[in-house]
Amino acid sequence: MFVRHLTLTDFRSWARADLELEPGRTVFVGPNGFGKTNLVEALWYSATLGSHRVASDAPLIRAGAPRAVVSTIVVNEGRELAVDLEITTGRANKARLNRSPVRSPREVLGVLRAVLFAPEDLALVRGDPGERRRYLDELATTRRPSIAGVRADYDRVIRQRTALLKSAAGARYRGDRSVLETLDVWDGHLAAHGALLMAARADLVHHLAPEVEKAYQLLAPGSRPAAIRYRTSIDAEDDVSAEYYEAALLDAMTRRRDAELERGVCLVGPHRDDLELRLGDQMAKGYASHGESWSMALSLRLAAYELLRTDGSDPVLLLDDVFAELDAARRRALAEVAASAEQVLVTAAVAEDIPADWDARRIVIRMQDDDDGRVSMVES
């Protein structure tokens, strides 16, 4: 799989970008702040419908523009697919597949399969559980695009049930049973949708765990073994069915209802879960050194890459300024993996950040002042 063409309109610092890409290695070179990371971000957005840098879509639209458009042409085993994504503030985003509108942008998920390495990856180890949940959900969706719908349904249920919990506390003291009966209904919705999401995550971690262990040994041979485990808010067993999770969620919500009503929040469900990262007998978060944390973060990404490869065609590798963050051993390990990828797209502040033996096409990025303000450009 590779991206043959990338077109941007009013995306971040790019008023317009029109790039012909090719298999192999391509390096976008330019000083920090010149917009090279925005190219990688656009490709990641096309693959996941999300940014690796911000939680909302609004910052992706260039200042003063009404909308941003990301267009890609992806080649997979000789077949071309064109994806157009239109991002608009305050309105639902639109998508086209092969120039035809689709009902939901989620319908283009799976066209571009990518794995992104970025400086922000350190948050996978040192950050909040939400970072690790997002990692799991993005990877699960890349493997099975239907998971995006499961996640959207679950998020909708959480919003509705949280609003109901906030209003139910007062109704309870007034003796109004109708609100509590409605809460029972939403308990069922949360259990049904939450169980599907938890089962998808658990299945993913089951297949991911051995790849993480192998990747960590590649990056840090002779060190403590790395291990991962899906830790749920209901202390469920590993590798169980959606039916088990559904029953366990219903039981946990029954037991914790008083606490939920008192606090007005959902205390049970996959939005409270975590991906447990361990080095030897210690948790990585709080105990891993800076180097160990980087090795664990890279292991998660390398494992994702290997898992996607076994599922089908090679995913596109996106390396956002990561070589500058790594020591020599980790740079060699990452370069070794990248050597076998069908397409690798890399950003670097200076060419010296790239392995010296890489045969890579270089595209120089610069900034220019014009009628659109200060915008990113490709040096001709």
From Swiss-Prot:
The keyword Isomerase does not apply. Its main location: cytoplasm. PROSITE patterns: RECF_1, RECF_2. The keyword Nucleotide-binding applies. ATP binds at residues 30-37. Keywords: ATP-binding, Cytoplasm, DNA damage, DNA repair, DNA replication, DNA-binding, Nucleotide-binding, SOS response. CDD domains: ABC_RecF. It is found in: Cytoplasm. One of its GO terms (cellular component) is cytoplasm. One of its GO terms (molecular function) is ATP binding. GO terms for biological process: DNA replication; DNA synthesis involved in DNA repair; double-strand break repair; SOS response. HAMAP family: RecF (MF_00365). The RecF protein is involved in DNA metabolism; it is required for DNA replication and normal SOS inducibility. RecF binds preferentially to single-stranded, linear DNA. It also seems to bind ATP. Belongs to the RecF family. This is DNA replication and repair protein RecF.
